[in-house]
Amino acid sequence: MKRWQSWLLLAVVMVVVFCGYVFLQLRTIEVERLSDDLWVLRGLGGNTAVLRTDAGAVVVDTMLLPLQGQRIRQLARELTGADTTQLINTHYHIDHTHGNPAFEPGTRVLSTERTLSHLQALDADFWQGEAARLLPTETFSDRRTLSVGGKTIELIHPGAGHTDGDLVVLFRDEGVLHTGDLMFNHYYPNID
């Protein structure tokens, strides 16, 4: 077999394996209720938070693919009975942001300034056309407190950690902290 054919076969096998992996993840999402109005979605390669407010759902981290984002959007609607009005990206890595385009135009998207800067610089090809509408629309550098539909959410940039634009999300009323990739269970996080 010619060398290029071997590489092509390897690429096809990798694509098939990856598609199977994504399909299995979408079928095996574990939903855990943390409070009356807060859920965590597990099984997408990370944790996505979904908060019900009187002004719609708030989603933290949308995962790797628009297909995963569609599933998150669907689950958020089922859990909260409302459309998602706000997305929060804890950092710029694609496994936390590339589901954004699955959400409706006009969805408020929040991140740190550094996260937006990295998304625009490092991943510019992805964020063209329709996807550009779901880049972060509001940014901050240090800390921001949101009042959303009767809920208080604090966005805190603790400094450089996993990336230089990390943020943690404190759901004040629920007493829950979403740490993005700053904390892992049973191992240490990577640092860029």
Q: Where do the model's predicted regions map?
A:
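Cap/insert and terminal regions of metallo-dependent hydrolase folds
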Residues: H186-D192
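Soluble non-cytosolic domains of exported or imported proteins
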Residues: M63-Q70, I94, L134, D192
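Conserved beta-strand hairpin/beta-sheet module of binuclear metal-dependent hydrolase folds
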Residues: E32-L75, L167-F171, G175-D181
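Core dinuclear metal-dependent hydrolase active-site scaffold
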Residues: T139-V176
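Active-site HxH/HxHxD metal-binding segment of metal-dependent hydrolases
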Residues: Q74-T145
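Solvent-exposed loop/turn segments at secondary-structure junctions
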Residues: G45-N47, A57, L64-L67, Y92-H96, ...
